[in-house]
Amino acid sequence: PHGYTPKLRKAIFEWFNLHLKGDTSPVTDDVTDVVEPEENLLVFEGNLPENDRMKTIQEWFIPMATPEPPTTPSDAMTWRDDVLSSLKGITFQDTFPEQLPRLCEVRTAGGTKSGQRGETWVFETADAIELRAHLVLNPGPRTPSPLVVCAQSPDQKRICYPSLSVAEGTDALIVDVRGTGATAMGVGMHDTARRLYMNIGQSLPERQVHDLLAATRLIQHHRTYAPVAVYGRGAMAPHAVYAALLDETIEEVIIEAPPLTHQDPNTAEFLAVLQTGDLKHNAAALVPRPITVVGALPAEWEFLTQVYQAAGCGDRLRTVDSLSAWTPCEWQ
């Protein structure tokens, strides 16, 4: 327990006495002046064992996948299917929302002189979390309009109405996934939530991917968009990648400054994801769907390029200088 009380301490001591000593007498004092000698508390006589591997246990106890890039189009598609099967069977067993979330209300958030309008969609997820998704409507000639969806970053400060710098004629959906917006948590509660979700075979980022998908499905049910693209910047780039992998109606992915590896403690944690592959490997399973990189693709992500080239889709890996420069890729 994180907090002790005299009543709790006495109960603990009585349990120890009963089961370790066979002593049934009641404990009357929860504090003692007895100090155990340090030599009685030392483990391994105060010296760590030679060749201690505990500090690297995460690297070898459960072997990590080390995939080799496929070399032919057919091999690339087979490899992709294997990756998707593994991710859905291990890491994302219950992530995709099979049922539409319950729509609570749609609030009009006003507009601008240029014709831009905003709506806030309040919805409830399958596990009864009430969230908000902010739809920014940008007038344009294209019908139906493209839609760019993103998960709100926990680092984003609360503002009156979120927005996304997309091109004219492209609508944007910013989803306040759990832990952001109205459900933002302080550092202590955030860490507690991370631990609790793992107790039930989930993780906070995995639940955020669920929220992102739920909002996307909700909007698609009520509005018509083509194409639907998902965007992730920095720490939220993995959310975009995995949301698209789980939902084939998301036709394009846009990433900016993605993390280099899931082994970085600052990268979103997804249970057992490294048994399938690292982020750069799993992102390559998006083939043949287009991926647009804002800025430059990190050199460490060369595996992604190799897979797309092997599949004959190298032209579907694009780069743009800014998100506002993104336009749909004509690939189908």
What are these regions, as identified by a protein language model?
Residues 243-244:
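Aromatic pocket-lining residues of Rossmann-like dinucleotide-binding sites
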Residues 229-240:
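Gly/Ala-rich beta-loop-alpha elbow adjacent to hydrolase catalytic centers
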Residues 1-146, 154-171, 178-226, 248-252, ...:
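Alpha/beta-hydrolase-fold serine-hydrolase catalytic core, especially in secreted/extracellular enzymes
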Residues 151-152, 175, 231-233, 256:
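Short His-Asn-centered micro-motif
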